[in-house]
Regions:
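Glycine-centered secondary-structure boundary/capping sites
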Residues: 1, 97-99, 142, 173, ...
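Hydrophobic faces of well-ordered beta-strands that scaffold small-molecule active sites
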Residues: 2-8, 37-41, 77-80, 103-107, ...
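Substrate-binding cleft of secreted/luminal carbohydrate-active enzymes
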Residues: 36-38, 147, 151-155, 168-204
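Glycoside hydrolase catalytic-domain groove-lining segments
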Residues: 113-164, 196-204
Length: 204
């Protein structure tokens, strides 16, 4: 068997009705507890189409976690849930005055728009440096344990429009051989960094 990580998605309604969000999260946890104790709270929280218009919206959702952990001892909660490399959003989710406690920092760390994992963003950050920065933030945070999970990454395939997230733009889509090479590089870099506990190739 394999450990399952269940991602609990938010919507704009979650932010508008915190009580309903809390009830929904509890229901999801209760439903899946026979199968797993691991849950990711929120998804792509720095993209408004997923319901959070800013990090404050997400932090309000996280403030429901203490009650959840009290009711279900032993559950493992991962959060931050920032997609792509946006360190200011990650910083805000990990350093704040809100009251919650995460067992792992999760990041949906796509680098496909750069091409290879060795390519740099902002002239400085290749994948290795991105991982080290996020891991360092998690290690210094009082809201999160020093564990880094990459809970989504991928290189969308050429000629799969309209099913690819970026509608098949050739700048950030690749053929299967290149995808396999880039994913191998990604996993190798993550392993060699010594700061990543797990990497998930996309989500179901």
């Amino acid at each position: 068997g394999r450990n399952l990580l269940v991602t609990i998605l938010q919507s704009r309604q979650s932010v508008a009705d915190i009580s309903a969000w809390s009830d929904a999260v509890s229901h999801i946890v209760e439903t899946f507890l026979p199968l797993t104790q691991e849950f990711q709270i929120g998804n792509a929280i720095n993209r408004s189409k997923w319901g959070c218009h800013n990090t404050t919206d997400y932090l309000r959702l996280l403030e429901t976690l203490p009650d959840l952990k009290a009711r279900y001892p032993g559950i493992v909660l991962a959060g931050s849930s920032v997609i792509d490399f946006e360190p200011l959003a990650t910083l805000r989710t990990l350093f704040n005055g809100h009251q919650f406690d995460l067992d792992a920092c999760c990041a949906l760390l796509y680098v496909n728009r750069r091409g290879s994992p060795f390519s740099k963003q902002y002239g400085l950050f290749d994948l290795r440096r991105k991982l080290r920065l996020i891991a360092t933030l998690a290690s210094l945070s009082k809201r999160c344990a020093s564990r880094l999970w990459i809970t989504e990454t991928n290189w969308p395939l050429l000629d799969t429009k309209p099913y690819t997230p970026n509608s098949g733009h050739p700048r950030s889509t690749v053929d299967e051989k290149t995808q396999a090479a880039y994913l191998s590089d990604y996993y190798r870099i993550a392993w060699q960094s010594g700061c990543v506990e797990r990497v998930y190739w996309w989500q179901l």
